[in-house]
Amino acid sequence: MEDDAPVIYGLEFQARALTPQTAETDAIRFLVGTQSLKYDNQIHIIDFDDENNIINKNVLLHQVGEIWHISASPADKGVLATCYSKTSDSKVMTCAAVWRMPKELESGSHESPDDSSSNAQTLELLCHLDNTAHGNMAGVLWEPMGDGKKLISLADNHLLLWDLQESSSKAVLSNSAALEGKGQLKFTSGRWSPHHNCTQVATANDTAIRGWDIRTMSQIYCIESAHGQLVRDLDFNPNKQYYLASCGDDCKVKFWDTRNVSDPVKTLEEHSHWVWNVRYNHSHDQLVLTASSDSRVILSNMVSISSEPFGHLVDDEELSDQEDQHQEDKIKEPLQDSIIATYEEHEDSVYAVEWSSADPWLFASLSYDGRLVINRVPRALKYHILL
């Protein structure tokens, strides 16, 4: 069973920001933000045509500065948020803003990758997330499955909850919390949990992971030394409400049960340098992607701590006697965790990896040299999970 070859797209500039177009559930589309100090920065809208295995792209100008983080509205295909750096009074500030892409680009295009970006279009600024009182923005999180009206931004040691009003042209700060303690505390990343009615957020600062209840803006759990070095990224299991994955500069990926945070449930040590990203598959939570500055992307099958530790179980009525016996044998043995594949198409640090929001078997990864790679879960594993 031959697997499809990876598809590679090169941006002209360095890049570290990647997001699927979350509100798009039919077409496979990703947004990539560039980091250039010399030229106008860009957002590339990448459309993947999986029938022909080719990429089509559109380019939007993002003239305000180099993009450190990008996230797409869960409700409106045309809306996105960026964190970008700009220089003012010879100081570099990282700001955040909400943008709208031109209407005709929301649903992609059919321009081939070789067309020049001379016909790049500009983004419409909807609103700034005002951080003058709070410091540098590290990320913007949209309320999962929300109506695209609620956002959280992480600014230095502040967790800020925003309401977007008047067709997203105005961001009103509705609540905030601050990290307190010794030293210069700064959030590095965060994830908004899709569980508990979207009332919980997890954040990383230094080596610690904290859980917050955004109704009271109070801390609900804290994993003090979650990693030996800086925690880079977090993700929630979409099917198990208390399960959280983290990764960091200690080259490890850890899985936590937030009801008992004294020890991780499981630890992976497959990367040889900092791990920048960890992502659960949206449908099949045993599939976990990690990206690292060892220039590799690893796909792991964490089935023992997934929502289906015994694989895909079938109703008794659907089985013949012989199959019944086979099913009983299957039930007795939990499946083994394993590394499914290591993807080595990158030659530089891989700063981002994301699953498609339209196809659960497809993902994109982005390395700092501007190389975007689209890969798929191996077919044999896909059928093993489905059948």
From Swiss-Prot:
Keyword S-adenosyl-L-methionine assigned: no
Q: Which Gene3D superfamilies match?
A: YVTN repeat-like/Quinoprotein amine dehydrogenase
The WD repeats lie at 132-172, 182-222, 226-266, 270-310, 345-385
Is ATP-binding tagged as a keyword? no
Q: Which InterPro entries match?
A: EIPR1 (IPR040323), WD40/YVTN_repeat-like_dom_sf (IPR015943), WD40_repeat_CS (IPR019775), WD40_rpt (IPR001680)
Organism superkingdom: Eukaryota
What family does the database annotate? Belongs to the WD repeat EIPR1 family.
What is the protein name for this chain?
EARP-interacting protein homolog
Q: Which organism is it from?
A: Gekko japonicus
Phylogenetic classification of the source organism: Eukaryota, Metazoa, Chordata, Craniata, Vertebrata
Q: Which gene is transcribed and translated to give this protein? A: eipr1
